[in-house]
Every structure is written in C-alpha cells, then in structure tokens.
Amino acid sequence: ELLQFLFDGGCELKNYLCASELGYVMQRELEPYGRRYEEALAMDFMEARTVTEPSAPEVETAGKGDLDEIFACAQRFVADCGLLDKPEKEPFRKVLDSFRILRADGKIVSMARIAPATQDDLRLVLVYTRDEYRGRGYARKVVNSAKNEILAAGKRVTLNVDRKKPVSYHLYLSLGFERMFSQGEFRRVDNRPGS
C-alpha cells in the first residue's frame, strides 16, 4: 500500500541502501510496478573494539600540502568502487586532518579517513592504496593505526567492505573487525523500450 501511495503521488525511488535481506524483498515488491532494481554494491558493515597490533609510527596525519594527492586518490577510490558520488575538492580541504596517510617513494601510497558516525563510533572511510603499492602491507598499517587511534579515544571503529573484494575483507578480519550485517545499494535498472 505504501508503494502504491508513493507512486500515485508522483514519487520515484531512484536507488536505495538497506540491509540486503530487505533490499531483496523490496526488489520483488517493486517489480509489479514496472520498476526493476539490482544490487550494485554488496557490502558488509564491520566493527572493531580491540587493539590487535601496535600502530605503525610511519603513518601520519595529512597536512595542507596533501590536498591534491588525497583528492586524486579519492577520485580513484570512487571509480574503483563504482560509486555514483563524484567528489569535489573543496570539502576535502576542511577535513584534511581526519586523513591518515603513509608515504613511500615521495608520495602518498595509502590512506584512510576517520569520519564521524555516532556518539559511540567513528568510521573508517576512503580506505585506499595505489594499485602499484598493493600487497605490501601499507593498507594494513594505515587501517590498524587509524583503528588504534579511534579505540584510544574510547570509540568503536566501523567500516563498510565490498563483499566482492576478498583481500580487503581478509585484511579487516585479521585486524579484529567483525561482520555485523550485510547491506546493499540497489540501483534502478531502466527497463523502458529502447533503453
């Protein structure tokens, strides 16, 4: 009844983010209305509450001179993940000190941002390592150091991990993260004739 009311009122449901189980139910319920959706991003919400290894001293807080490089890495992250959001540079300037970075060969090779979440949690977002530096332990050092910093502040650490990226998933599990629930971003599939 709610869906009929919304659609009769001219509302549209472009995309939705929810627990995967609910998303699949919504897929079935929306089909009779001629609206098809598919799960474009399949993620697990994870949480960590304990220190599992010491922080890496070479992980540092980003500074003003890192803006261009962080923004370039963020753009690659968004493209790699298939996200629809297109980052804009200026907002990054305001949150530079929330990025933890690791340098090698004179450039940032791995990064993560500590972002607000709830009163009890902080989230790790924009966890990214340049392609040519993957598999060398850089992401582990950045994620672990940021995680330890959050825990030292008396907060829980949360993040989302793409279920299609087993290397990242294994990294987070090895650092003490536990899966709490699955969620997905469901995107509308245009099924009109000629599309």
Segments predicted by a language model, with ranges:
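Acyl-donor-binding surface of acyltransferase catalytic domains
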Residues: 1-56, 186
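Conserved acetyl-CoA-binding loop-helix of GNAT-fold acetyltransferases
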Residues: 1-5, 129, 135-152, 169-174
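Short amphipathic alpha-helix that is part of the acyltransferase structural core
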Residues: 49-84, 195
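Conserved beta-strand-loop-alpha-helix junction that forms the acyl-donor binding cleft
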Residues: 17-23, 158-169, 185-194
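A short, aromatic/hydrophobic, helix- or strand-capping loop or linear motif
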Residues: 17, 82-90
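A conserved beta-strand-loop-helix scaffold within acyl/acetyltransferase catalytic domains
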Residues: 87-105, 109-128
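Recognition helices and adjacent regulatory flanks at domain boundaries
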Residues: 101-104, 115-117, 136-149, 160-162, ...
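Conserved active-site alpha-helix within GNAT-family acetyltransferase domains
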Residues: 21-38, 140, 163-181
